[in-house]
């Protein structure tokens, strides 16, 4: 088991690699927002529309020992290649930025927003950008 090095800032959850799996632990701090987003159906809608990285609820097979205090678990597909914004060419930066903005607008239209706007929340599946941080999606409040 190895926590992803880039997954340490958000008290709502962490991403870890375990037995060739990508898992996201949701901790108590993230339960209210995650529950609201999940119960609204917006996660499945955004996944279905290709905006958001797919996620499944994994079978409970002893995962709690990997991240004590985790309340919920998500499992994501393993990406063939992980890249970072400082490695991207201009066209990839542009595609990622436009995806991020369009995704945020789509969320706002459904009563949700993003808690942060970091380029590190975008990865590429082939040449297509996809948002990867499910716990950054929160209910919009005036």
Regions found by a protein language model. Name each.
Residues 11-12, 118:
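Residue-level marker for the onset of beta-strands and adjacent loop->beta junctions
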Residues 1-5:
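Short, Gly/Pro- and small/polar-rich lid/capping loops
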Residues 19, 24-27, 36-39, 62-75:
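N-terminal structural segment of carbohydrate-active enzymes
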Residues 6-10:
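A short catalytic or substrate-binding loop motif that flags glycine-/basic-rich loops and adjacent residues
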Residues 12-37, 86, 90:
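ATP-binding glycine-rich loop module of kinase domains
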Residues 113-142:
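Catalytic activation segment of kinase domains across protein kinase-like and atypical kinase folds
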Residues 53-99:
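Conserved structural core of kinase catalytic domains
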Residues 37-51, 89-115:
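Conserved kinase catalytic-core helix
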């Amino acid at each position: 088991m190895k926590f992803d090095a880039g997954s340490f800032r958000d008290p709502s959850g962490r991403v870890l690699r375990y037995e060739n799996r990508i898992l996201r632990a949701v901790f108590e701090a993230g339960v209210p927002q995650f529950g609201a987003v999940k119960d609204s159906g917006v996660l499945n809608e955004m996944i279905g529309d290709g905006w958001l990285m797919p996620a499944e609820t994994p079978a409970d097979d002893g995962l709690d020992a990997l991240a004590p205090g985790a309340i919920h678990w998500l499992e994501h597909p393993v990406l063939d290649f992980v890249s970072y914004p400082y490695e991207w060419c201009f066209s990839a930066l542009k595609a990622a930025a436009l995806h991020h903005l369009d995704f945020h607008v789509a969320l706002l239209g459904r009563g949700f927003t993003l808690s942060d706007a970091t380029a590190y929340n975008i990865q590429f599946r082939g040449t297509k950008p996809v948002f990867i941080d499910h716990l950054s999606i929160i209910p919009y409040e005036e």
